[in-house]
Each structure stands twice: as structure tokens, then as C-alpha cells.
Regions:
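Glycine/Thr-rich beta-alpha phosphate-binding loop at enzyme active sites
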Residues: 1-44, 86-89
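Alpha/beta catalytic cores of nucleotide-metabolism and tRNA/nucleoside-modifying enzymes
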Residues: 39-57, 61-139
Length: 139
């Protein structure tokens, strides 16, 4: 499978079979107030309409993070830094421990949310809530 890795801020070139949506690629993590990948994910998913695989990679740290991305339309979620931290601390065992913990958190969050399978992670299971005052949105 070919994967194109580039900045996605708006719907753009859709010739490759997969796109990785990451805030690292467009300063979402470095510039305070920049749009986050999770906020733009539904727009990108709507635009490509199932024509390509969307891989989400942006600050995934918990099972809830995974569910949010899947509910908003990502086909898969990539986890990098936490696994690297585990690897640095205890090699392969550390990386595996991080992944096991993340998967346990995912299944617990799914259970508490009434979601039985990953296939049930759909947009009707999530909503955007805007809190008055600071103008920031929470997903």
C-alpha cells in the first residue's frame, strides 16, 4: 500500500490511496490556537467519501482519543510517542505494556460509552460542545 504523507489543512489532492492526518504536519501542535486535526477530520472524511483510507495521528494518548477519531471518520489511529516512551524505558516490554494499556483503556471507554465494536464508532456517538467564554471547543 502506498501512503502519502503531507500537510492536510483543507481538502486537497486525493490521488493516493491513504492520507495521514497529523497536527505535526501543519504546526497544530506548535502554534497555539491553530486548528487541530480532530476538528478538521470530519471535513476531510466527508470530502473523500470513502475513496481513500484516513489514518489519524495527532496526540493520541487514551482510549477516548481513539474513539473520538474513529467516530469522526478515521479508518485507523496511529500511536507514536507513547510507544516510543515505553520503548525507551523498557525496550520491547515497555512498548508492549503501553499498547496493552492503551487497548485496555479503549475497550473500557467503549464499554462505558455503550459501544460494543469498533464498527459502532460512528458520528452519532459523538458531538461537539462549545463552552461560552473562551471561544474554544471541546470534543
Amino acid at each position: 500500500m502506498t501512503v502519502s504523507l503531507f500537510q492536510i489543512m483543507e481538502v486537497c489532492d486525493s490521488r493516493s490511496p491513504a492520507k495521514i492526518l497529523s497536527n505535526y504536519m501543519y504546526t497544530g501542535r506548535q502554534v497555539d490556537g491553530a486548528i487541530g486535526s480532530l476538528e478538521v477530520l470530519p471535513e476531510i472524511v466527508d470530502a473523500v467519501g470513502g475513496k481513500m483510507t484516513i489514518l489519524f495521528d495527532s496526540g493520541v494518548r487514551t482510549g477516548a482519543d481513539i474513539i473520538k477519531a474513529l467516530c469522526l471518520g478515521a479508518d485507523a489511529v496511529l500511536v507514536g510517542r507513547p510507544v516510543i516512551y515505553g520503548l525507551a524505558i523498557d525496550g520491547k516490554n515497555g512498548a508492549e505494556a503501553v499498547m496493552k494499556g492503551l487497548l485496555a483503556d479503549l475497550w473500557q471507554t467503549m464499554s462505558l460509552s455503550g459501544i460494543c465494536t469498533v464498527a459502532e464508532c460512528t458520528r452519532d456517538k459523538i458531538r461537539k460542545v462549545v463552552y461560552p467564554g473562551d471561544g474554544k471547543a471541546m470534543l
